[in-house]
Amino acid sequence: MERILVPIDGSKCARHAMEKAKAIAKAFGSTVVLLHVNDFYQHVTLYKMTEVEEMFMEQFDQLSKDILAEGKAFFAELGDRVETVQLEGNVANRIIEYVNSNSFDLVVIGSRGKTGSMDFLVGGVAHKVALHAETSVMLVR
């Protein structure tokens, strides 16, 4: 188990996923890649952004960086075996694209994120990733 992807969004379930991934990484000497997808970009017009949209975009970008920094701090004991990636767009689609275009042995993802989704048992993003990722996926509550 060389590489583990952990999509994070700052939610409680994402924290639980990080805890599981950390235990696995420590046991196998794995590299952990923390991924945060900023979905604000899919809600703004590409033609011309207003000042308010630009301000929100900057705030969401900083929030993404903060989430990744907190995640990296959580995995500090792994040293250089922790990487962070920030992407923009539809959360589920970008996670799936990233997983399927890179070499991962496992995806560890929280069963529900911050979207407030009321999907039965499993959130929409986690469900879509589990169905479409071309590697093993562990859903964590």
Residue ranges and their predicted role:
Residues 30-31, 80, 104, 135:
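Short glycine/serine/threonine/alanine-rich loop segments
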Residues 73-107:
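Structural beta-alpha unit
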